[in-house]
Amino acid sequence: MNKYLSILSLALVIMFIAAATSIAQHEGEKLSTEELASQIGRSESELKEIDNKIIVYNETIKSNPEDADAHFNLGILYEKKMKFKDAISEYQQAVNLKPDFIDAHINLALVYTERNMFGESINELKQVLEIDPQNVAAHKYIGRSYYKTGMLEDALVEFKKALEIESNDPELYCYLESVYFSMGRLDEAAAELKKAIEIDPQFKVAHLNLGFVYYEQGKLDEAMEEYEIAIGIDPKFADAYSNMGLVYCQKKMFDDAIAILKKAIEINPSLPDAHNNLGFAYWNKGLQDKDNNADENGNEWKKKAMREVTIYKGLIGAK
């Protein structure tokens, strides 16, 4: 789970499944081909290829309605097109035809999760555990649903069960860290992230999250070091630049904050928190200049701040 710092919000986003939440809130059939291609990062030609495959699988099912694999593959294609209702229908038909079809149960559970249907997702994953009690993905995604619904103790249990089965999965330690963080157990959160990094030193999300934990603990230099490592792994990691900007703000180094936040926005103009954080940096730069009797640009800083906050609100859909 990523943790992105901002003044007005703290975005907690789990990155490890196919579609982002902002995408999952829309159904693909409501978008034009061009809009859909932009949303899901595919070319229009790729979408047309998916459409052709959908036609083929529909023909297969028409001739053999009891082909569970065809329903499953059609569900995947609908999911790629963001036609989630259709995807759910196909996955449901797949598991009805083949009750021990684990991949279909898991895919169905993940679509439920993306639509915030957490109870349905958990029920589906529990069916997987009845088939295979050692299924790591089922424990992991049940824990994820528990976490998203605030059932932290239950989430902790599921993530630990997953780790008992697969102890070398760095993502699991990040999930576990998220629970500890939400419980306010920051030392334990940091310890889990260090385990993830020990397994995979190039795991940029773990470095990002560890920087966040250090920031919350007031360990600003340590936080900055983790963000620098994350950027060293991925120089285009906009979230790390954004978080680094608030560390500079905390140190009252607003010029540096503004520069690094502009870098984050240059990499990803649609990153809401980077705009929000830049607005915070502009606002405080104006206050700093006022305190230093250098307030000739005070109104300009405020205008810049409000412009960034307006962009931020637009990106998150706030009015």
Where are these regions (language model features)?
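Bacterial N-terminal signal peptides
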Residues: 9-17
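N-terminal leader/linker segments that initiate helical-solenoid repeat arrays
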Residues: 21-69, 73, 82
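Terminal, low-structured helical/coil segments at or just beyond the last alpha-helical repeat
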Residues: 27-42, 48, 276-319
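Structural signature of tandem alpha-helical TPR/SEL1-like repeats
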Residues: 45-59, 81-93, 114-127, 137, ...
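Helix-start (N-cap) detector for alpha-helical repeat units in TPR-like alpha-solenoids
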Residues: 68-69, 102-103, 136-137, 170-171, ...
